[in-house]
Amino acid sequence: LGCETYASDYNPVATLILKCTLEYPQRYARGEELKEGPLRGDVSKNLLVQDVERWGNWVLEEARKEIGRFYPVDEDGSIPVGYIWARTIKCQNPACGAEIPLMTQFWLAKKGDKRVSLYPYVADGKVEFKIVGTGYEEMPKDFNPDKGTVHKAITRCPVCGSVIDGKSVSRLFREGKAGQRMIAVVLHNPKGKGKTYRVANEKDISVFREAERYLEEKRKKLFDEWGMDPVPDEPTPEGKG
C-alpha cells in the first residue's frame, strides 16, 4: 500500500513473518530483466525467490559435504530423511526380562488411502518389527495400530503380557535403567512420490554411531574455539530436564 510502517517483536519467527509481509513484498516485488541467454529481455521471476533458491541450494550443498555420509543412499536410490526411535525398558517379570519399546501407537502413515504401520511380533524372546499396510505386506485383520505397548501410563510386555504401572516406569527412568532403540527409517526417493519406510538394520545403527563420534569431535573443536559448550546444557526445571 506504500504506507510507512514500523514494527518490532522479540520473537525471531514473528520478526521474520513481519518482514515477509511488510518489507519484502515492496523490496522484491519487481522482476529483473534477463541480460543474456535465449530469454534475454524477458523479466525473470521474483528476486527474492532467486535469492532463496540460490542460498537454499548453497546450504544444501554445504550440508551434503559435511554430513552427507550419515545419510547413505539405499540400493534403489532412496535417501534416509528420518529415523523413528523408541525409548525402552526391561520387562520386570524375572522370567522374561525382554526389552519393551515404549510406543503409544504404531502408525507410520495415516492419511487418505495410505495406511502404513509398524507391526510388532515376538521372535526368540525379542520384540521385532516389520512394515505392513499400503504398499507393503497386508495388515493382519486382528491388528490395531492404535494400540501400542503403552496405554494410560500402563506398559504391557508384548513377549509375556506382564504389565508395568506408570510409577514403576518413571522410577526406571530416574534410575537410568531406560534405553533407546532405532525402530524404522523414513526414506525419500527422488524418482518416486511420497515417503517410504523400512525397518532399521545394523548398517543404520553403525551410521548413527559414526555420527555420534563426529558430533563429539565437532563439539570438542568448537569448545576449544569458543571456550563454551556449543550443546545447550542449561537446566529446564519446568520441563523436568
PLM segments and residue spans:
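Charged, often flexible domain-edge or linker segments that flank or initiate folded functional domains
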Residues: 1-241
